[in-house]
Amino acid sequence: MEKPLVFLDTDVLISYLRGDLASVHLFDREILDRVCLAINAIVLQELLFLAEVRNHPEIVDRIQEKVTILDFDLVKLDQYWQNARDIRNILVHSNDVLILSSAANCDYLVTYDKKLKKASSYLYNSKPMVVTPEELLAQLESKV
């Protein structure tokens, strides 16, 4: 059985760096054996601008060892911009639309961002399921 593809938003990586238990648990070996974590270049860029990372650049290497870097889905991106004005009205930053385009074919988008979750409800497919780290861990636990 193929592992679920799990896209991590920047806020989840920030909570990981700050030691929040649910986000830290996502990087535990037992979870990594069950899912494939992913980010895109936008999330990586946002991560590089954090003070914690500037002071300790080796953190990025540790994260990159555990995630897959996804490309942008340009077809999805074009659909979102053309057909989903509601998304543009909800999201403050165009980076979020780029994040949605990369996460479009993932099974889960893990975020604490309520606006991103609301914007994803305007998408035309059932993927990804937008959850918090706690919700993802609970779902994985229920599938054991």
Segments from the language model and where they lie:
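Metal-dependent nucleic-acid phosphoesterase active-site entry motif
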Residues: 1-22, 39
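Acidic, PIN/NYN-like endoribonuclease modules and their adjacent C-terminal/linker elements
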Residues: 1-3, 110, 114-144
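PIN/NYN-family metal-dependent endoribonuclease catalytic core
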Residues: 8, 24-54, 69-72
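A generic structural signal for short hydrophobic patches within well-formed alpha-helices
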Residues: 13-14, 44-47, 116-117, 136-137
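Short, flexible loop segments at the rims of nucleotide/cofactor-binding pockets, characterized by
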Residues: 13-18, 48, 85-92
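Short acidic-hydrophobic, aromatic-tinged amphipathic segments that line or gate anion-handling sites
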Residues: 69-75, 129-133
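Active-site neighborhoods of divalent-metal-dependent phosphate/nucleic-acid chemistry enzymes
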Residues: 71-122
